[in-house]
Regions:
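Active-site helical microenvironments for divalent-metal-assisted chemistry
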Residues: 1-168
Length: 168
């Protein structure tokens, strides 16, 4: 599948329609978060349409009524796999969900980059920094070794964000 600008724009539209009525951080339309994740990728010089399309769709299986198969049919296997790999598994609580999800994310280097962009956006713009700080060692331990070298700057940035949190 060719990841064109047109397909990226279609992914944004699908995401906007699918997330309609949802909010981010209880006050913003959900597309703010989607756009934040896209901007994080661009800031770290990750500008391929494949990654930007996956960013536009990264929460669509988890939070909306779109299935893996629908994502695959319209956006291709690679995009569907990335989105699936960052989609939380079922669990009794957040800790169990993450414990089940992180190995799946770690199996796909592009999904790791996508998850890093998601986490950076959540820490920079969301109100849940304490929760993410508590999870950070397990999160990094599960994903760091399989992270492409080109994305190590994203880990450095996360380290800095959480260091600042300790000061404040």
């Amino acid at each position: 599948m060719e990841y064109t600008d047109k397909l990226f724009n279609e992914a944004l539209l699908v995401s906007e329609l699918a997330h309609r009525g949802q909010s981010y951080d209880e006050i913003f339309p959900y597309m703010k978060h989607i756009n934040d994740v896209i901007e994080v990728l661009k800031r770290f010089d990750i500008k391929s349409n494949k990654m930007l399309i996956a960013a536009a769709l990264h929460d669509i299986i988890e939070d909306c009524a779109l299935s893996y198969n629908k994502v695959k049919r319209y956006f291709g296997h690679e995009i569907a796999e990335m989105v699936y790999c960052v989609t939380d598994e079922l669990g009794r609580d957040r800790k169990e969900k993450k414990r089940k999800t992180l190995p799946k994310t770690a199996s796909n280097p592009d999904a790791i980059i996508l998850k890093l962009a998601d986490r950076i956006a959540n820490i920079e713009h969301g109100g849940k920094i304490d929760m993410y700080a508590k999870e950070y060692q397990e999160f990094k331990g599960a994903l760091f070794l399989n992270t492409p070298h080109s994305a190590h700057g994203m880990w450095e940035h996360l380290d800095e964000l959480l260091k600042i949190k300790e000061i404040v």
